[in-house]
């Protein structure tokens, strides 16, 4: 009567499986772009020219699935990656890949009867421990040479790009 299609799932596992299927479709497309050896992805939106990109966010933004429950998984993971972009300025592709891994593993525990609330508490505790460990082992950098070395690695070992980035960071200051 309202023009809304409703599909009833007899159990949460069926619904979770559909959502995870959508997450997998998104993560498979996006993960191909990850890292220095990431691959280009060709996107051909209906009625528009194709786009070739190695940017995971661009790939993610074009993905919309016809199945509403699979698309729900896509939209939730896109939201998580957008929050990563807003907070960190980068890392969106990595956040999509990590979110998929977390959901896959969580599904195993939920299927075995673990409470989703307890699972979330465990994930939160693990995240705190990871952040604490990273903070403990982090090595502060300050010199232009250290910045150049790191930037060079990030630029596929192109020393000239590393030097340019180090100079720019030095001029902008540590807080930009």
Stretches found by the model and what they are:
Residues 1-176:
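N-terminal glycine-/lysine-enriched basic segments
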């Amino acid at each position: 009567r309202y023009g809304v299609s409703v599909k009833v799932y007899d159990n949460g596992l069926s619904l979770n499986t559909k959502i995870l299927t959508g997450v997998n479709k998104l993560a498979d497309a996006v993960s191909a772009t990850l890292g220095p050896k990431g691959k280009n992805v060709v996107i051909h939106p209906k009625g528009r020219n194709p786009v070739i990109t190695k940017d995971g966010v661009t790939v993610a933004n074009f993905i919309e699935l016809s199945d509403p429950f699979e698309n729900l998984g896509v939209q939730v993971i896109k939201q998580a990656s957008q929050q990563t972009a807003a907070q960190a300025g980068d890392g969106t592709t990595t956040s999509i890949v990590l979110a998929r891994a977390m959901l896959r593993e969580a599904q195993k525990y939920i299927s075995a009867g673990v409470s989703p609330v307890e699972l979330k508490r465990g994930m939160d505790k693990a995240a705190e421990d990871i952040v604490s460990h990273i903070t403990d082992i982090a090595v502060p950098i300050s010199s232009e040479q250290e910045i150049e070395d790191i930037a060079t690695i990030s630029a596929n070992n192109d020393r000239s790009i590393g030097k340019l980035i180090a100079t720019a960071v030095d001029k902008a200051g540590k807080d930009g």
